[in-house]
From Swiss-Prot:
Protein name: Zinc finger protein ZFMSA12A
Species lineage: Eukaryota, Metazoa, Chordata, Craniata, Vertebrata
Zn finger limits (C2H2-type): 78-100, 106-129, 134-156, 161-183, 189-211, 217-239, 245-267, 273-295, 301-323, 329-351, 357-379, 385-407
An example Gene Ontology molecular-function term: RNA polymerase II cis-regulatory region sequence-specific DNA binding
Record-level GO BP terms: regulation of transcription by RNA polymerase II
Keyword Zinc set for record: yes
InterPro entries attached to this UniProt entry: Ikaros_C2H2-ZF (IPR050589), Znf_C2H2_sf (IPR036236), Znf_C2H2_type (IPR013087)
Annotated Pfam families: zf-C2H2
UniProtKB keywords: DNA-binding, Metal-binding, Nucleus, Repeat, Zinc, Zinc-finger
Amino acid sequence: MGIQDARWPSEDEETHLLDSSSAEQTRGEKCSDSTPDVHIVEEYEDRAPATCQAPSTSTDTPVLSSSMICPPRQRVAHKCTQCGKCFIYRYELLEHQRLHTGENPYRCSQCGKAFRRTSDLSSHRRTQCIKAAYICIKCGNSFQSIQEKFRHQCVHSVQKFDCSQCGKSFKKMHLLGKHELTHTQNRIFTCRQCGKVYPGMSELRSHQKIHPPELSNQCMQCGKFFSSSACLTAHEVRHRQQRTQICARCGKAFKNKHDLNLHMRSHTGERPFQCTYCGKRFSVSGNLNIHVRTHTGEKPYLCSDCGKAFISAGELQIHRRTHTGEKPYKCSVCGRGFTMASKVTLHMRVHTGERPYVCSECGKGFSRGSELKKHSMNHTGVRPYACQLCAKTYTCLNHLKRHLKTHSVIQNQSV
């Protein structure tokens, strides 16, 4: 089945269009009868426009428009002739007017459902339309699951390189060359720890990650372990590389001025990059790009073993360790291995007794910020997790789950 949408929204369009009508109401408010259909709105620092003020929202997370993030000197306000609401951008007015006309120009080619906005269609295809969620955008083939879609190799118009000895095909010439070595070379690579044999060094190294590393090959500066002393020596060279840029506040050294400036934001609190969906700010643009994917649902990094998708390469790398068994970060006290460096830091507090997160109300200390957050709810009275069956509330999700089991037990006893 082919994709037949007359117009598929681009990423730029989805970035401009908001996903909820509440954002539309935040931008536009009724103007007075004397207000012309198009007029100039002056914007100044620390106050809203004089002619069209955006009403405040009662939610904790405000919806921020692009004009609030980077306010220009002047904006042209566009007024709806039917209800009097004003909008800064013309595309916002056109989108709003579809509420009056009932027009839904964006139609899903798989199920026929129509939508008023491109972002609604995009969200529908990602999360609701079963037929559209598993379609190859290159060839139009549909699949029953995301795993089948991932395993599907779309080879249309892709040049293939065939092995002359066994007929196996490859997409790239260097992959074919690497494969042909398995026919011409008699050399094999054996794991010294378990005796398994592999045709190439890369396959052997990938296998060796499942074995616990030798304790003698540990970097004294960062704690990482290596399979050989040669790898450890090469790694230690990176620590000894000249770092001339020194932070005046904490003494940390960096290779160049750019890295130092990025680091300084951790001291100054500067976060110049803001999310247009929820208003959250970031010190690095790359972190913002990854965060935006939590709103758009984009997960471009796929695991080649199970097909699971992730929003960043870092998350995929950590997930891959569940398949390989690799735990490169070791505790220097007890030798326990971890898949992430941050988990080692948290674990070390078990040995040191460090509790850096202190409650401002009672002075109690905690090793994790999440534990302090849960504890603070006892002082504030906030209990965000409510049971839908008996209206009991809890400060912790696990406590709610444990409570819900009591309902299932009572129901089974009554039967």
